[in-house]
Structures are given as C-alpha cells and as structure tokens.
C-alpha cells in the first residue's frame, strides 16, 4: 500500500520524498522521555526551493530553504529550542559505530537493522530493532532533481546527518 503524501506536496514541481525517522522526547501524557517514530517529508518545489516537514508528537514543523540541509537546519533549530520544548526534542543520529544511534541533533534517514539507543550520561542502553521501527526505502529515481536530491540521500545514508 502506497503511503499517502500530505496535501502540501500536491503542487510541487518534483516528487515528494517521505521517510520515517527516530525522535527522542517527552510523552505529553506520561511525562516519560522515550523514542518515537517520526516522519520527514521533503519536496523540491523548484530546483532552488525545498520545502520540508517533520511530524511527531509535537505536531508538524515546516521550513523552506535553498537546500534540504538548509530546511532541515531550520526545523532542528525549532525542535531544539528549550523555550518551546522542555526538554528539547532530539533526532537520533548514527555515530561512528554503524549499529548505534546516539541522541543528537541530526537526522539519519537510512537506518541499520539493529541498534542501541545511547542516552548521554547513562551507561544503560535500550536495544531496539530499528528495521521494525523504521522502513528503509530505496533511493528514489529522479529525472533530474536533480542530482542534488540523490546526493542528499546518499549524504544522509553515509554520514548519518
């Protein structure tokens, strides 16, 4: 079954991309901090205008930038703002060990198959099956967005940004 894309992606010049991402933040009901499955959607509206949205328990955060990185930087800034969220939301990032996700401010869109969640200041780790939590997708095939979009996907995959 194909995933329903948000309404805002209907009028873009290029196909939208959707991925699930791991988030870490406080449950509004219980107050417990935990790992969440979030969603990131981005689309090249034109070759120089990228619109991105991150969805999670906090709702939707959207930004537009000249590149995927610029839009993502703006959203991370909002999620990490301690005046808006206490504690700030974090997105899990892959570290130098390919099987470990650390709490960080960057996004890794292509997960490994098994991972530990490493919480700063604690020795205990929570082991999660990332493939069960996230669905890795093949790199989409584009006409020409160009190569920037393909390169961005590869950058996310290789460097865990």
Annotate each language-model stretch with its function:
Residues 51-53:
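General beta-strand recognition
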Residues 2-48, 61-65, 69, 73-80, ...:
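Long, contiguous binding/interaction regions
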């Amino acid at each position: 079954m194909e995933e329903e894309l948000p309404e805002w992606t209907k009028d873009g010049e290029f196909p939208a991309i959707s991925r699930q991402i791991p988030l870490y933040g406080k449950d509004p009901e219980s107050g417990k901090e935990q790992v969440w499955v979030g969603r990131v959607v981005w689309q090249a509206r034109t070759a120089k205008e990228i619109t991105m949205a991150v969805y999670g328990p906090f709702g939707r955060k959207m930004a537009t930038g000249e590149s995927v990185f610029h839009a993502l930087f703006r959203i991370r800034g909002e999620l990490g703002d301690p005046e808006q969220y206490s504690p700030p939301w974090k997105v899990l990032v892959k570290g130098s060990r390919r099987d470990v996700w650390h709490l960080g401010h960057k996004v890794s869109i292509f997960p490994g198959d098994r991972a530990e969640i490493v919480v700063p200041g604690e020795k205990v780790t929570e082991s999660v099956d990332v493939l069960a939590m996230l669905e890795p997708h093949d790199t989409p095939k584009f006409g020409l967005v160009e190569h920037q979009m393909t390169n961005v996907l590869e950058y996310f995959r290789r460097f865990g940004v």
